Amino acid sequence: MGNELQLENKILKGTTTVGIRVNDGVILAADRRASAGFFVANKMVRKVLYITDKIGITTAGSVADLQFIYDVLKNIYHYNSITKYGPISIKGIATRLANVLSATKYFPYIVQILIGGYDDQPRLFNLDYLGDITEENYVATGSGSPVAMGVLEDEYNPKMTLDEAADLAKRAVFSAIKRDSFTGTGVIVAKIHSKGHEELEFYLNKKM
């Protein structure tokens, strides 16, 4: 129990991520700060990565573990694509990752993963470090998630457009930045839809 609580605390500290699913696609958003304890280790970390043009992944927890998992999932996707099985679905990728996390639960990756994208429809999955998997319409993870989730619960509407969802995700993460010292610098917002993805970057005083 003690080790489990320590792991959960490590996952909760250091970031805020948001995922939103609407009819037009999926939004993945994350702040850019990496912290080591109370020390700001890096102000410009990338926490949103792309397995394909239409599938993204982000995490609360260890960025190094995210990068390793990202490489594994990207290899799985491309291996399937060149075999008789063909491209794997977003649900298939999430299920494969859940199996990996479950198999390593005694020596776990320190992650809370969001996988989102568009295949025949928008999909958004939330996975914890034990391999538990849920499909969500909206979700927030990390140290700033209580603040971000409050914004999402107040304003989420399944009929909102992808642009409206992107704005909501941005505001949810910025709300966390204002209240949570482990979340900071700015926000990357990925808009994933049937034709690919677009990425926006927002900072406290400017848009890039």
Curated annotation (Swiss-Prot):
Subcellular location: Cytoplasm
Gene Ontology biological process: proteasome-mediated ubiquitin-dependent protein catabolic process
Residues of the active site: T15 (nucleophile)
Sorted UniProt keywords: Autocatalytic cleavage, Cytoplasm, Hydrolase, Protease, Proteasome, Threonine protease, Zymogen
Residues excised as propeptide: 1-14
CDD domains registered for this protein in UniProt: proteasome_beta_archeal
Entry GO MF terms: endopeptidase activity; threonine-type endopeptidase activity
Primary enzyme class: hydrolase
Catalytic reaction(s) noted: Cleavage of peptide bonds with very broad specificity
First-listed, main subcellular location of the protein, grouped into a coarse class: cytoplasm
GO cellular component, one term: proteasome core complex, beta-subunit complex
EC numbers for this chain: 3.4.25.1
Pfam families: Proteasome (PF00227)
Regulation: The formation of the proteasomal ATPase PAN-20S proteasome complex, via the docking of the C-termini of PAN into the intersubunit pockets in the alpha-rings, triggers opening of the gate for substrate entry. Interconversion between the open-gate and close-gate conformations leads to a dynamic regulation of the 20S proteasome proteolysis activity.
Gene3D superfamilies noted in UniProt: Glutamine Phosphoribosylpyrophosphate, subunit 1, domain 1
Domain of life where this protein originates: Archaea
Family per similarity comment: Belongs to the peptidase T1B family.
Subunit and partners: The 20S proteasome core is composed of 14 alpha and 14 beta subunits that assemble into four stacked heptameric rings, resulting in a barrel-shaped structure. The two inner rings, each composed of seven catalytic beta subunits, are sandwiched by two outer rings, each composed of seven alpha subunits. The catalytic chamber with the active sites is on the inside of the barrel. Has a gated structure, the ends of the cylinder being occluded by the N-termini of the alpha-subunits. Is capped at one or both ends by the proteasome regulatory ATPase, PAN.
HAMAP family cross-referenced by the UniProt entry: Proteasome_B_A
Function, in words: Component of the proteasome core, a large protease complex with broad specificity involved in protein degradation.
Name the record gives this protein: Proteasome subunit beta 2
